[in-house]
Amino acid sequence: MAKTLDKSKKRKLVKSKSTNFDKKQKINKQQQQPESSTPYSSSSSSSDSSDSESDNEFDPEELRELLQPYSKDQLVDLVCSASRIGSSIYSAVVEAADRDVTHRKIFVYGLPWETTRETLVGVFEGYGEIEECTVVIDKATGKAKGFGFVMFKTRKGAKEALKEPKKRILNRTATCQLASMGPAASGKGHDQPGPVKISMGSMANHGQPQQQQVQGQHVFNGGGMAASPFMLGNQYHPLYGAGMLGNPALAAAAAAGGGYMYPMLAGALAHGGLGSDMVQSSQMGGIGVDPSVGAAGLSALGSYFRGQSLPSTYPDSDAGGKRGTGKDSDAGGSSFHGYSNYS
């Protein structure tokens, strides 16, 4: 009995040893499998990470080339959308804007003559720390020219100051704006237009008035409104018709008088001619032509309208120095309806 018990014990011990050995082998196999797989996985992950790092590596030149085709609006939209994704981009944009003088420098105009740098600093220092302040001074008088510049250290200070563009400085109301916007546009008053004058030098542009500004006077080339203090014409007036275009000498004679066409000459042209007695008259300055032109200047009119008479503007008057036909017919010189002349 004792022998059989010993044998059974030996068998149990052998079985337990074998099971323990099998367990150890299984554990070793399980430990060896991840060890064999880890080198492969680590190498693959390291290669992937190196590729991703090489793709995402920041290259300023490449980024500039990528952004070059975009317009300004597209770039602004791109930065705004990127700022929503990452706050770091927004903070970078704000930081760059704070460093830029464009958003921090203010132009102040409408200052009193007594304004000094200390006066301007006292007005704007409540909005933020001031980095620089300048009042432009006239060297001749030593007084302010009426404008100056204030530059804040931060963009926030300039933004706060511009919330109220009108500032009361001493006894005047000044206005401020960003200096990057340029000088303020000067207000244009309702000035009355100067005398209108016609240029007869370019009659080829008939019907196409071209307005020019010459020494404060409005000049119309070609057709347009006549420039006589006694008559206002238009582009359909016979003055600009065949009478002027058909005879260059006529246009030259009219231009010699400064372009002023009085009713007598305009009426003559409107009715198709100018009498020969008018052409040879000694009072050529009275019909809108410079007296210096003389008979030589209007000789072309006589040859062009010879044989045609000038319609009388005042039927009861005689402009040729004859006696009037009114009740006071004995009055000498020119008279109208019997009233003697003032000479």
UniProtKB/Swiss-Prot annotation:
Residues 28-49 have a biased composition (Low complexity). GO terms for molecular function: identical protein binding; RNA binding. Gene3D superfamilies: 3.30.70.330. Residues 104-181 form the RRM domain. PROSITE patterns: RRM (PS50102). InterPro entries: Nucleotide-bd_a/b_plait_sf, RBD_domain_sf, RNA-binding_reg, RRM_dom. Residues 50-61 have a biased composition (Acidic residues). Acts as a component of a complex regulating the turnover of mRNAs in the nucleus. Binds with high affinity to RNA molecules that contain U-rich sequences in 3'-UTRs. May function in complex with UBP1 and contribute to the stabilization of mRNAs in the nucleus. However, unlike UBP1, UBA1A does not stimulate pre-mRNA splicing. This is UBP1-associated proteins 1A.
